[in-house]
Amino acid sequence: MSLASLPEFAALRSHADGVRIPPDASVPLTPRVRALVDSALVRRLARVSQLGLVSLVYPGAVHSRLEHSLGVYRLAVEFLVRLEGDARFATLVGTEDASAFLAAALLHDVGHWAYCHPLEDMGLPELPRHESLLRGLLLDGEAAGILARDSLHAGVPYGRHFDQDRLLASLCLDERGEALAITEKGRTAAELLVFARYVMFSEVYWHHAVRAATAMLQRAVWIVRPAIDPALLMRSDDASFADWLTRTAAGTPAAPLAAGLFGPTRRLFKRAASFDALHHPEVHRAIAGRSYADTAAISARLAERLSARLATPVDPHTLLVDAPPAEREVEFRLQVRERPARHAMGATHRWHRLEDVSPVVRSLAHEQFDDLVKRVRIFADPVPAAAIASCEGLEDIILEAVAG
């Protein structure tokens, strides 16, 4: 039985039974897909926001993990439609495999609990992981769907300027037939996708105020970590998590942090200092990529030194050193298939990594993102933040705190 017999193919073409999601996509819902979408496991994702704390800075960014999952599933159907005519793919993938792939695309986030990405970045053994089976098999096609939707809801244009249709049309199998790749015709579209991710990280996902909120959430959870119940977290949605953290933080130094994020009044900490790898290599190298336990200890020592230097006392619980995750976020592992020269009789396709044939990707993912966007930042309550920002010799004080 060929892939063309999949009911989702016909549903995609007919638009007869589906649901609409932004920007302007019709998601095909066959009876078997609808049964999954209507299950309690998937419906919980309607109560988990896709961008979490980003909505504190971009108020429109309140779309859900359910909307995102529907978009990834639709993209997976489009992948299969494109690859149906690939002889190698048709040999390797039958209808059962394809059906499992579609189910995995729809269900890839069912393990997502509220605010799990910033909390998983802490690397705490108390916190569960939400990883899902087929995430790596989607060619970062998930990213293609994410960017346009996140950009639309955030009210910014940055994630919508790449040619998704061209990227889909260039899909093929990689050299070993084990993963998705693109033909050389899709290289520019892939470069634009990487650029869109770069700008979205720079201006939205890692906006300095979003990082402030993230640092506040991480410190609050760090303070109350003895009370963490992994099973409860795995079932949480945004509202239940906020309620749990607010109640658990009551009477602890985490209380003002939780209140600033989830209370009736929004109160985000202010940026006291920022250090990128290009202009402040020593401080950046000393802190970036450290464990959360290390940055918490550095924060405490730094607060002690700053309190001795400044007229304003600095609370060690509310001085936050934000070290971005070590993993690179904007490039993706992808092979590009280059066709042989027309005069080369008997020659086969040549294969290259995208970053090896694209100076754009190399520059964005390495020089630009690692050196300029992945900044180490110091956040604090507004009053001490202003004093810290004007503190003379701050870099030396920070390096002393790092050294212990």
Pin down the residues of each PLM region.
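Histidine-centered, transition-metal-coordinating active-site segments
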Residues: 1-100, 112-404
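Short alpha-helix carrying the canonical HExxH Zn2+-binding catalytic motif
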Residues: 99-107
